[in-house]
Design a protein with these regions (language model features):
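Non-globular, low-confidence helical/coil segments that flank catalytic cores
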Residues: 2-24, 31-398
Length: 398
């Protein structure tokens, strides 16, 4: 009976088609046009959604989109629930902007090694694109090196900063001008800085004075009371950013008499959101990375690594990388314009061995990781992984 009814329906459809063949052609064209319009809207208007669909069809997995998208010139149109981590291309230096899903912002370091005016202007233009209300909720200086601190005094002057996190290091500038500026600061605030080591550079003094005179701003030192306590924990709408800072005991026992020891006071941050973890490092290295690994209990599965110290071979140690087990590495560096030979091929090889996708500001320009139900990567310049896998030799073999 069913077969008989099917045959009748088929015959009826055939007769209808013979009577009005144009209707079928018009309907087919309409369907094709609708599909074409839908494709254009999705592909050009919502590139991230398109890439997510294609990733699922390719079987790339349900959690991570391992393909970079072109960073829009006017900035990313974020979707509800997005958390984004921006690495600005400042050449040899560091500048990380975090935009939290509840509307708060955090800036970690902001500088270029040569204090270049063009780089400074570009960095502020980028910040202005996303920080539209003239206010930054959090600013952190990881350590006192010039390529992390140079622009921060201007950041504090330009924006109302509510919270500043900084090293337990007193500014003792050699120039008479900045010496007088520091001496004029509030004695109660100066008494917070308990470490015997000091920094005498003018750029640190500029930041130091700007930070301690910022109105209505909370100053917190990057110091943990002990290894079981995190002094800096930022919590919000479904996100947590926990910093593992040097302990008071570490500051008391250490002498910051070398570049490596100064770098090692950089806090290591773990940003958690929607099941994803991002590792933030400053210029962390082989001194403080093992301390972090011990404090997390030896293993903490993460996703994205902000590479420490611009890809130096004394950072991103084997033990550290094995402990965090990331899929992505992003590096702030300028391979063609620095005397330090960063990033080192030795370091790059460690990422390659772990099958990590590598992004670099010297090749990719600005880099943005967006976290929601997936990870999406935006870059200013798209290059192949083969390009990003070429580092520089160590200075001894250069």
């Amino acid at each position: 009976m069913a077969k008989k009814n099917y045959s009748k329906a088929k015959s009826a459809a055939a007769r209808a088609a013979r009577r009005n063949p144009k209707a079928i052609i018009i309907a087919a064209i309409a369907v094709i046009l609708i599909l074409a319009i839908a494709f254009c809207i999705l592909y050009f208007g919502f590139p991230r959604t398109w890439e997510n669909i294609m990733s699922s069809l390719r079987g790339d997995g349900t959690d991570v989109v391992d393909a970079s998208l072109q960073l829009p010139t006017g900035g990313i149109a974020f979707e509800e629930g997005d958390l984004s981590v921006h690495m600005l291309d400042v050449g040899q230096g560091d500048c990380i902007l975090i935009l939290f899903p509840d509307g708060k912002e955090m800036l970690i370091d902001c500088a270029n090694y040569n204090n270049t005016a063009a780089v400074r202007e570009r960095a502020f233009a980028y910040l202005d694109m996303y920080v539209k209300d003239g206010q930054l909720d959090y600013v952190m200086l990881t350590h006192c090196d010039s390529d992390h601190v140079y622009f921060l005094d201007e950041v504090i002057d330009k924006y109302q900063v509510d919270n500043i996190f900084m090293p337990n290091v007193l500014a003792e500038p050699t120039s008479d001008r900045w010496k007088a500026e520091v001496n004029a600061l509030n004695e109660e605030l100066l008494s917070m800085f308990t470490d015997k080591d000091t920094v005498d550079t003018a750029c640190y003094a500029e930041f130091f004075c700007a930070a301690l005179t910022e109105p209505n701003c909370n100053i917190t030192l990057n110091v943990d009371p002990d290894e079981d306590t995190n002094a800096i924990v930022i919590e919000g709408e479904d996100y947590t950013l926990t910093f593992y800072c040097p302990t008071q005991e570490y500051y008391d026992d250490s002498n910051l008499n070398s570049a490596e020891k100064k770098n090692a006071v950089s806090p290591i941050g773990i940003l958690e959101y929607n099941g994803f973890r991002t590792v933030l490092t400053g210029d962390s290295n082989e001194i403080n990375e093992p301390m972090f690994v011990e404090r997390i209990g030896g293993k903490l599965d993460c996703d994205v690594l902000k590479v420490g110290h611009h890809g130096s071979e004394t950072s991103s140690t084997e033990e550290f990388l094995d402990a965090i087990d990331c899929e992505y590495a992003f590096i702030s560096c300028n391979a063609k314009g620095n005397k330090f030979n960063h990033p080192r091929q030795t370091t790059i090889d460690r990422f390659i061995e772990r099958d990590m996708a590598i992004y670099r500001t010297d090749n990719n320009g600005d880099i943005v990781f967006v976290f929601n139900t997936r990870i999406t990567v935006y870059v200013q310049n798209r290059v192949t992984q083969d390009v990003n896998r070429v580092g520089l030799p160590s200075l001894a073999s250069a």
